[in-house]
């Protein structure tokens, strides 16, 4: 927008112009803490039915990546300009592994990328999980929601004792069990009972719950799972702090487009990509 057009817009639509400027300034502020890089595909493989893991080698360091943060990855096709938000499963040196589910043309195109190809990636995005001083953490993940949780367990294994409860639709969709088992105890649940206990991750957690056993609960999964968890904690009077990572459709990844807005318990809105994706379970409506 030229200076002349901007001035005209400010006169005609002052409230809207001020909002747009404020969002733009906030977006620029966020950019200081992340980088858009041209990464090289190191490995791209199927790890379960419809689930893939792509490892990218970054040309430079992006600093510390917290478990629960995510990346916006280009699909490598000009016909699909929007980057896809993918969970960061691990970060070692300049190698970053993103896990994703084949769901639509964009992720299908990503799955076809081979070692040596270049892809634009914007990272790290979001706030991630802050474990604070917690030493005993209950982990509850469902489906693709286990990806950011796996990064947390990897990052803190040895320093924190994790009790993980992860759920899948069936055995064919199970993945990353080795990561969670290295962090502590692991219970797997499947909807059809083909692996582990029959049921879901929330049910597995509740059946094993002992008061005082966890300093903190962290969770990520589909909205129906998070709602069930929130209701169960309330019904059982469980006061342990619970942090959840929300799954929402995203556009820009920096809080400017407002596609991923969620409602907070106080009536205000929050942008999942910038203000989250991790929130206290009692601070957001699910």
Task: Give, region by region, the residue ranges found by the protein language model.
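Short hydrophobic alpha-helical segments enriched in small aliphatic residues
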Residues: 3-6, 18
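Short, charged beta-turn/beta-strand-edge "cap" motif at the junction between a beta-strand
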Residues: 76-80, 123-128, 266
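Ferredoxin-reductase
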Residues: 32-115
